[in-house]
Amino acid sequence: MNTFLEKNRNVKIAGLAVAVLMLIGSERVTAQFKSSSFVPYSSVSVGLGTSSYYGEMAPYSRPLISTFGMMRWNVSASYARHFTPRFGARASFTWARISGDDYKLNNGDRGFPINFARNLHFRNDLKEFALTGIFKLIPDSRSYDRRPQWSPYIFAGIAAVAHNPVARIPDLDGDRWVKLQPLGTEGQGSPGDYPKAYSLVTLAIPVGFGVRYKFNQRFDLSAEVGFRFTTSDYLDDVSKNYPDPNVLKDDLARSMSNRSAEPTAARKGGDRTTGLRNFLTQQYGITDAGIDPFVAIGQTEYATPGTLRGNPARNDNYLLGNIHLTYILGSPIKCPPLK
């Protein structure tokens, strides 16, 4: 029970932020509808930017390298309705790629030797549909053409995210990427005390801030940073324990579940010999230079069934940074009534 509460604490905090923002917005809407001074308007935007993943392969304890070490891209499109001078709502679609690699982030003197030994990697193309409320710190004037030159804002909402993590198979089997969820790399769906396969759709709570610059009467340029708290610990296909390899469905599932004995890092290549020798020395006191480290790792208790493969106490999350080009649709012209 404590693990469940700890794991969902961030989502609850983010949910509270959403509720507060929506409450502020609802009060503003009520106040503004009592006045006819502001003319609501709409806008459409396209954007591109960066994406960073946080999880088993990119821990919060190393914020800089986790944010920038495996930074990838995102593209987005959105529609927004501005109801009052301060409050608006936005519907958006974002395609974001996230990625992680134990070898890259833990090779050499940096990082965690135990993560280097794990030798997992992944990439995941996220398809996010989000509904967010926007609160402008500097209010608009009564019409869109009189909006301020600079307008900082905060936002929060809810999102549905479709995902499907993949990884490159060992180099001896050829250069191709495979979907990880059907393999059940932690025993998902196998007989015995194993969980069912994880869902490829998850909920997320987007929260963030940005600043909008009025380029001219119809166009804005904005910069935005938003963090996504998700309800999934499987964006990277890593969460709990190593399974009994005998329950996995085939050799491919076994090779993708435990990659500690691979001589080469599969995602981009790279000799793992020195790093694995260092891990065996630090963790198990194995110092014999004549021992093959890729054989020796299999003779230790590392990655035995039931030992930790991930961190089940915390879900995976991601951060998006965006530049948006926005076109103001304006408001319909109100014709005087015919008499």
What spans do the regions from the language model cover?
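Predominantly the C-terminal beta-signal and adjacent terminal strand-loop region
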Residues: 216-339
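Residues on the lipid-exposed face of transmembrane beta-strands in outer-membrane beta-barrel proteins
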Residues: 46-50, 77-81, 131-137, 156-160, ...
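Surface-exposed strand-loop-strand hairpins of Gram-negative outer-membrane beta-barrel proteins
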Residues: 50-78
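Repeated loop/turn-to-beta-strand initiation elements of outer-membrane beta-barrel proteins
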Residues: 54, 86-89, 140-142, 218-221, ...
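Residues that define the transmembrane beta-barrel architecture of outer-membrane proteins
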Residues: 40, 69-73, 125-129, 150, ...
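Gram-negative (and chloroplast) outer-membrane scaffold detector with strong preference
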Residues: 85-87, 93-178
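Outer-membrane beta-barrel biogenesis signature
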Residues: 27-45, 141-149, 304-309, 332-339
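Extracellular loop and loop/strand-boundary signature of outer-membrane beta-barrel proteins
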Residues: 60-66, 115-122, 141-143, 190-197, ...
